[in-house]
Every structure is written in C-alpha cells, then in structure tokens.
Amino acid sequence: MSEIKFSDPNQPQRFANQKKTNDKRALDIESVYDGEKLSGKVVLVTGANRGLGEAIAKELISQKAKVIATCRSSKPKYEGLHKVIDGIDVTDKKAMDKLVKDLEGQEIDILINNAGYFMVEKETIENPNFDEEVKMIDICAVGQIRVTSALFNAKLLKKGSKVVQITSQGGSIAWRTTQNAGGPFDYGHHMSKAAANMAGKLLAIELAPHGILVQIMHPGFNKTDMTKKYEKIWEVEGAVDASVGAKRVCHEINLISPERYGLFINCEDGLQIPW
C-alpha cells in the first residue's frame, strides 16, 4: 500500500512552495479540471444563495448540470437554476420534510452539503460564546446529517449518487498545533468542523454498501464574506476567488470513485488532510 501524501498544514509555506514548484494543480485548476463530466447531473446544493455555495452552483450551471439550490431565507439572485427551494433551515426537521416534498420525487446524483455558519467574533477561553458554539455545530455538522438522512430515507439518493461534505481544514485535530499556535482559537468553528468531518466519515462507511459515495472536502481558502475576518492574510496564504474554489470542488467531485472516497481532501492541492 502506497504511503499517503498529506497536504502541508503551514498555509503560507504551502502556498509559497506551490509557487516555487509551479504546482499547476494548485495554481491553475483549469489545467486539470474537466467540467463537462458534470453535464446533465442533478445536483442539490445547500446554502446556494451566497459565497462558495453560490459559486459552486454557478459553476455547475455553466457545465449544464441541473442545479437545485436550497436556501434558508434570501433566494439566489442568479439565473439558470433547475429549481430553488427556499425556507430550508438545516437545523429544522420540518424544513427537511419540506425539502423532500418540494423535490417531488426528483432523484439526486450529487448532494453538496455546503450550508454553514461562521461567527465573526474571535473566541478565546477568556471570551467563549457557548450559544454560538452550539449553533455552529448544529448547522455545520448535524445539519449535514439532517439533509443527507432526509434524502436517503426518501430514496432520493441512489446507487451511484455522491455526497460531498464541505467542511474545513479547521476541523483537522492534527493541524491545530501548527495552525492555531498563538491564536485565534475560535472554539466553535473548529469543533463544528471536526464534528462535520466525523459525520462525513461515518456517512461514508454507512452509505458505501448502498453504492452511495461520500467525500469530505476542505474547499481551500476562498475570498468570501465568511472568511472576511481573515482578509489580512488572504494574499500571503493564497486565498482565491470563490469561482476558482468552486472549480476545485467540482474537480474533486469528478474524482470520487469506489477506490477514492471517505477521505478528507484539500481541494486546493488534491492531497489528503489528516484527521
């Protein structure tokens, strides 16, 4: 068995090395990405009304996929969607019933669990926000289980379907010593992403016998409203426009197979991240 090659936890160093070695996979996703493979696929994207979710949906539309966008309140302001289902709060069981009802029996080829929440204020042990921590875990981790469970129990996920868990490198316990040295510590964010990673791994194990493949993905460092509190380090750490991040995610979706699933993938370079 070949040795696993992991991504570098030191993001400034990782980005510098990518430039030094002219890593096309990391620096020019267009050089490896074949979006035509997504043509005709029915894809459901949660949290598709802004940020990375919007960018992923737009990329899929450009590749002629049939995109179903869900959102909690404000509807997407772009065109080309196959369907929009609003009122989908991933923390609400009744919203899951509505989601299934509004899908009207439509089977899903690819489910992208993207809906998330990131508290703006930074957390330390001196100023924890317990309510916000629980909220982040409920949305980012339990929410992904709610959506996947609702679709699976309604038989809208089938053999050959793919489930993508959008999480974060922030959920890697192994990387905390490097990435959180000196803070910020952001307990809620990191706990919610670690929980999402665990949920994704368990889903991958449980759904594989049904022919449904699950992958856990860190989408890379993207310039969105959710990461704006880190904008001072965007450039040194290689943050990209969300449109580029979307292509990275879609490229990794194409690579999901019976031989490559249930992994924690850094969409930035295609390498694994340790749990």
PLM region descriptions:
Residues 1-42, 274:
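Non-catalytic terminal and boundary segments that flank Rossmann-like NAD(P)-dependent oxidoreductase
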Residues 6-8, 18-24, 209, 216, ...:
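C-terminal helical subdomain
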Residues 49-59:
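N-terminal Rossmann NAD(P)H-binding glycine-rich loop of SDR-like oxidoreductase domains
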Residues 61-78:
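Conserved glycine-rich Rossmann-like NAD(P)H-binding loop of the short-chain dehydrogenase/reductase
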Residues 80-94:
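Rossmann-fold cofactor-recognition segment
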Residues 112, 164, 214-217, 227:
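Hydrophobic structural elements of the Rossmann-like NAD(P)H-binding subdomain
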Residues 117-137, 145, 159-209:
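Catalytic loop of short-chain dehydrogenase/reductase
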